[in-house]
């Protein structure tokens, strides 16, 4: 019996060959069925196909092979070869199974693991010598229990003066895997510290239920507003990416002790500033790369060590000398004095600091050449340098009083000597004035220290110090954002905006840098929950831009944007000082259309314009010496003055400015008004507009003065 072509084609692969062979052989032992009718089939040409392994016996054969279909006469030989190969494969499989069954599973040798595939936890940072006992378990807890990655420990105890965080700072950094991991880990860390008697403050932490509440409120607000939420990149108050856990100062002593000078005499009493401040910075990976706090604090530490190396631990002789050719204090801008205790401003949301120490402070006697006599005129004038050093280290009131005296001393110097006082020495070390200033602000409360630093920056800018430019202001802004200036008043932030735009820039790139720095300051205001689009901010930017001169297209575009806010933005009513400053700067640059637009701001808020504002307008119009402008101003403003509620009374200063405007509008009005006799009515003279105004003003000035 011969195989049909269909059977031969079905036995193309090795498995099909074996199955077809069994069917072919078994056909001899069974009765033959009647053959079906013969059908003509068209043989297709030889094709290529892939073989596969359907049974374990063929595991040793190649996975994929390409074959060409052989001719019909070669098929019987192929079938015999396939049967022989299958028998060999089955025999080898059975042999391997029998051999493997003899070895129990616990004696089978596993394949060796490559050393690089074994996971080893990263080493923990080394604990600095002299650290508190809490540091080692804290580092292990943050690494093992919280699962923070990339731990880094910075020893900042060598920074002099110490930062606002506290003395002897040790800062631990860790990276969280996600925002949720960050908040959960910080919450566990605070609870772990609380169990050990440490009350830590975690800035940026959302509690266990607070996050759910904020998300629920955000979704409800988005539903009510018909929006999907805040735009991308906006601060939603939920995604922080950074939590600062401040453990406070470990080992702080609140016991008062007696201080003695080098002669063994009692110099005072106070609480010593001791202990170590521990701060744990937990951040997400992207936030950590963005802030780069390690780089910032490492740079601060390096610069502090460089200064200490230059000083070599010894203060040189002071160079405080007064010269007879001192310039007046009006030569450069005098900033607002430093204050230390709270008191309300004109607006309830503005606070400032004041102290009674200012009333008792005397002028600094700068005729000596050492640190102790630089404090002469104070109650500690006979103390030794070590006594002064101890007092400045412990007594906050003494530091504030010293800052007041240094302020007065700087204003008493000629401009060139004042510039040298706020500069570095030839060897790169700070001057005696700057060294004493740094010592005075050391360990002061954050608000007082920043007020003192901003005062010094403003004084240096007024002196046109070359090192106090935009780069210096940018460094201060970054330090404020990272070290914290939460207690600083709003007025100081506005002063910072004035300092930024008070630097004249002649290129568009410089103006864009100013705009970028101003946005950083505005962002800090926004993070405090204060309104940023307000008249004090807008007026500060407009005034500074106009006074420095608008020299570039970018500066003109920026000025136009802020001027548009005066009439379009929904802001609170400005103060009297803000309106007067805008009137001054627009009158100085002869921008009269904008001048009158500012004059009409108060009526838009239904507010009464004051006597001081009317006086300023009349003075500015009189200074121009233009008849048409003086005539229009008198016709508009005098009539509006009578219709204010209550009416504005004429003060002596206002009367003087009005007389000057009348002389410009009608030069003969004054002489005609004086020549009119009370007994004789001259209708020709009385009908003149400004003659009647002159007589009316002099009649009302008596009761309005």
UniProtKB/Swiss-Prot annotation:
Keyword Mitochondrion annotated: yes
Compartment(s) of residence: Mitochondrion inner membrane
Highest taxon of the lineage: Eukaryota
Any one of the GO BP annotations: mitochondrial gene expression
Biased composition (Polar residues): 330-341
Originating gene: ATP25
Role: Probable mitochondrial mRNA stabilization factor.
Primary location recorded for the protein, binned into one broad class: mitochondrion
Source species taxonomy: Eukaryota, Fungi, Dikarya, Ascomycota, Pezizomycotina
Gene Ontology cellular component list: mitochondrial inner membrane
Keywords, alphabetical: Membrane, Mitochondrion, Mitochondrion inner membrane, Transit peptide
Name listed for the protein in its UniProt record: ATPase synthesis protein 25, mitochondrial
Residues covered by region (Disordered): 83-102, 330-349
Transit peptide: 1-31
Topology class, membrane: Peripheral membrane protein
